[in-house]
Amino acid sequence: MIDTTLPLTDIHRHLDGNIRPQTILELGRQYNISLPAQSLETLIPHVQVIANEPDLVSFLTKLDWGVKVLASLDACRRVAFENIEDAARHGLHYVELRFSPGYMAMAHQLPVAGVVEAVIDGVCEGCRTFGVQAKLIGIMSRTFGEAACQQELEAFLAHRDQITALDLAGDELGFPGSLFLSHFNRARDAGWHITVHAGEAAGPESIWQAIRELGAERIGHGVKAIEDRALMDFLAEQQIGIESCLTSNIQTSTVAELAAHPLKMFLEHGIRASINTDDPGVQGVDIIHEYTVAAPAAGLSREQIRQAQINGLEMAFLSAEEKRALREKVAAK
């Protein structure tokens, strides 16, 4: 189902949601951190979704073990490097990795700015080593409040040339986008792109707010857009992309089953929607699974899957020249 003549992208992929279980085990031993299990086989149920979680917040607790072992900046650098290695292994030509340095820093009180620098170093080294093209999206974790998000923003701004976009993720219901207007004003002033997690736990009004108040050019998940016909029309007309994450939305119980996922309807409506993983390490999936298993189960035709693959590059935070060069590079292989 993947068109090998086209670039394969993943533009909604959390770096801190893709920490290998083996790495969690090794870092736990290295830093003498107590883990819920001492072998890879027995650890996996604690760090990967085995059965669908009842809600988004329950799903997010599965992420915690990955960041609990980030006891040093070297550990942060390692998982960033491994994220690029994983992207290469799964055949990705281009990936946008998003991360929350405050979340990564929290368990061991690491310097937030230091985490940003370590992630940049690890990703750059990975790109040089494995030949994958990558850009970084800074996440503000809304769950920790406005002040913590301000600290994350300042850390990103210190490396503004290495950050491509700003995102807002976490507890969408408890911390609406209206709390973060000034943060996004500064991000736009820095020349960054804007993508926002919206319409995952909250309704279509959260998506409208992300677009109108925060300046979102893309929406993460956005499944609740299906409830508002005017919003669907607006997304299509303005070419505001939806970063769909099929398996993730089932595992968080955002959508009941793949057959009910709105991605097919987004594509039929002319909305620029793409296929992405979200937190592949926690989900136990990769981009190949999303294209070859999840997308057909969601009712997408072969042509719709191809269109979603095309959309992934069209939506990417790349210049027109960068997109052209990537197309030519893949076509020449």
UniProtKB/Swiss-Prot annotation:
Catalytic activity of the protein: adenosine + H2O + H(+) = inosine + NH4(+); 2'-deoxyadenosine + H2O + H(+) = 2'-deoxyinosine + NH4(+)
Keywords: Hydrolase, Metal-binding, Nucleotide metabolism, Zinc
Important for catalytic activity (site feature) positions: 221
One Gene Ontology term, aspect cellular component: cytosol
SUPFAM superfamilies linked: Metallo-dependent hydrolases
Function: Catalyzes the hydrolytic deamination of adenosine and 2-deoxyadenosine.
Co-factor binding details: Binds 1 zinc ion per subunit.
Active site (UniProt): 200 (proton donor)
Native organism: Escherichia coli O7:K1 (strain IAI39 / ExPEC)
Protein name from the UniProt record: Adenosine deaminase
Stated family: Belongs to the metallo-dependent hydrolases superfamily. Adenosine and AMP deaminases family. Adenosine deaminase subfamily.
A Pfam family per the record: A_deaminase
Residues annotated for Zn(2+) binding in this entry: 12, 14, 197, 278
InterPro entries assigned to the protein according to its UniProt record, in alphabetical order: A/AMP_deam_AS, A_deaminase, A_deaminase_dom, Ado/ade_deaminase, Metal_Hydrolase
PROSITE patterns: A_DEAMINASE
Gene: add
The enzyme's E.C. designation: 3.5.4.4
Top-level lineage group: Bacteria
GO molecular function annotations of the record: 2'-deoxyadenosine deaminase activity; adenosine deaminase activity; zinc ion binding
Binding residues annotated for substrate, in chain numbering: 14, 16, 170, 279
Cofactors demanded by this protein: Zn(2+)
Gene3D superfamilies linked to this entry: Metal-dependent hydrolases
